[in-house]
Amino acid sequence: MEVLASRLHKKFFLVPLQISGDSQVMHHSRYASVADFVCRVVESFAAHAPADTTLVIKHHPLDRGYHDYGALVFDLAKKHGLKNRLLCIHDQHLPTLFDHMLGAVVINSTVGFSALSHGAPVKTCGLAIYDIQGLTFQESLDEFWEDAQIFRPNPELFARFRAYVIDHKQIAGSFYKGPIGGGPGASIAASTPRNHATSSLGAALVATHANE
């Protein structure tokens, strides 16, 4: 982390990987596998990224016992002449990485949504609910490597979209607290009343940007 936060500050792109069996990869992307995604991203980076930038592949913490991409990353570095410009990491703190990276490339991981909350440029390569004009980079991956330095997500649009998702798609509760009334099952806290004004504004703003 020290190297990423100092010598490589604002000089690296982050590629947070999803679990190999993630249905979002299987059904909502054009990639045959996470490994296929890695190969295509590295190929694009090698051909189009500025020579002083580094690509950092971050393994999903829940997939480490099942898949090891270290050998693949090593082979890709040799194939594309990316010695010292292609790294593979595991346990680094994501919010800290967001603050030091140039941008993130994801398939459709929720990590992309988290990166947007930090005002970081994000390029999605699959179908994602947050892949909206004004939030994510809408041009090609090949163009992202150069344009990420000037592209920024719209903070007002993100705030509205986040509020809309929380209001319409989330339930306040916990799987880890005791059950309500002593009965079986997870504890579901009472939801707060919806803020219909915020929801309507959020929906309208999202729709406006999506149609531009």
Residue ranges and their predicted role:
Residues 71-89:
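Nucleotide-activated donor-binding/catalytic signature segment of Leloir-type glycosyltransferases, i.e.
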Residues 29-31, 71-74, 122, 139-141:
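Short secondary-structure boundary/capping segments
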Residues 90-136:
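A donor-sugar binding/catalytic signature common to diverse glycosyltransferases
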Residues 135-212:
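Leloir-type glycosyltransferase catalytic cores
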Residues 47-51, 79, 100:
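Alpha-helix C-cap/termination motif
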Residues 50, 81-83, 117:
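Short, well-ordered coil/turn elements that cap or connect secondary structure elements
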Residues 1-72:
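Conserved catalytic-core segment of nucleotide-activated headgroup transferases in glycan assembly
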Residues 20, 62, 111, 129, ...:
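Short, glycine-/Ser/Thr-/acidic-enriched flexible segments
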